[in-house]
Amino acid sequence: SLNISPETKLGKIEGWNPEEFLDKSNKKTYSITQGKSTLGKFTETELKKFLDSKNVGVATNGVMYRSDKDGLLPALLRKWFDERVEYRKLSKKFHEEGDREKSDYFDRRQYLQKVVLNSLYGVLGLSVFRFYDVDNAEAVTTTGQSLIKFTKKITNSYYNKELNDTKDYCIYIDTDSVFYSATPLVKKRFPNLNIKDEDKMSKAILKIADEVQSYLNNGYDYFAKKFCNLDKHRFD
């Protein structure tokens, strides 16, 4: 994923728009700012060669990050995430052993880790924070927005292709998730299935959910490469 951290930030592509950049008819030229310096004009082809040669990822707001070495913030997040996983395992272990006190303790610990994990990138936009950087804060939010909108778009595409229509089937969209009903696909595939039969509906929904998730994961590979210039990601 994007290696967002103060020391991995390389500069910013002015006027960057990933969808526009992918348009083959795009004749726009781009400039890159690095501190107070500006690197000339790049065509779409020249910019692509530049990004590949430098091995950098690009956020939706145009900020570039080196990909060859882990940044401080991603390293911290990985450490805290691994600790949360361990706390959750311990909470489950002690719960199964009947030790409620220790189970509750580690459950609280894992929850605190979750709060810290969710807060780190958000606090980048706080002016009193040690690593305050508007570009980095915007890189997180704009790329997240772009990814969730992309998710909605390709999920609708999946539904539209199978149902042969152009409807928007998204029920709700959040900062990190989209909600869809599997019922339209169930009715199309199993017209004689009684949707009130919970057992059969559950099996049908799980099958569809697995298929849609696999489709989305392939889409995320495309998003990472084309929108962010990344070969590896954790968008799944």
Residue positions per predicted region:
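Conserved acidic
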Residues: 1-236
